[in-house]
Amino acid sequence: MGSMMKNDTDMLTIQIKCSGPIGGLTVTADSKGNVKGYVHEPNVILPPKNGKLDVGGALGQGVMTVIKDMGLKEPYSGQTILQTGEIAEDLTYYFATSEQVPSSVGLGVLMEKDNTVRCAGGF
């Protein structure tokens, strides 16, 4: 999403406020693909669900807000209710409902046994 920004100073922020144990998260990205983010409560350990990281269980119910600051007077802001708690599915839903753009988003995280991230990626 950040790579879709046109100007070097454009910024994208995604905020999720949720009822799950992580409490929410914030991610920012620029047009060059630089991304940083944090979760409100990082020390949450959930058991795997079907052998995979249980992102939906960590988030629970909530709201996702996408803010695009393109240097205009006011930033563009779109908001959707989390549908599944799986971030890729919720971003796909956001694109369809808020921006009316048919899209598919895929994300993956490979975890180490000590609950640290080994690698992550997406499209």
Residue ranges of predicted features:
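Interaction interfaces in information-processing and related assembly proteins
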Residues: M1-F123
